[in-house]
Amino acid sequence: MRSLVFEGNTWIAYEQMREQDKKLHKALCKPLKDMLRSDPGAGLGKPERLKHNLSGLWSKRISLKDRLIYKFDKNYIYIFAIGGHYDQP
């Protein structure tokens, strides 16, 4: 089973979401749990392999506006961003 690794400030973003927006936090937890149980490149959140300058990373939908940006190997799922869409400044 894989483990989650929160890179940079993503743990802070996770905790802020948990405190400030319970509904969005619950929506985030569903794909996280799904990725831990099965293939992180499939399942909930419409997984999408990113291209160009984000090549090697994946995206899953949390809401219409928010995304989870991550990559994975056989042991870990690395979380790089939680929140806004990856093409927004």
Task: Name each region found by the language model.
Residues M1-S3, W11-K26, L44, S59-P89:
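Enriched for short, Lys/Arg-rich terminal
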Residues D34-I62:
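A short, surface-exposed loop/turn module that caps and links secondary-structure elements
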Residues H25-R37:
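PIN-domain endoribonuclease scaffold, especially VapC-family toxins
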Residues P31, L50-N53, I69-D73:
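Short alpha-helical linear motifs
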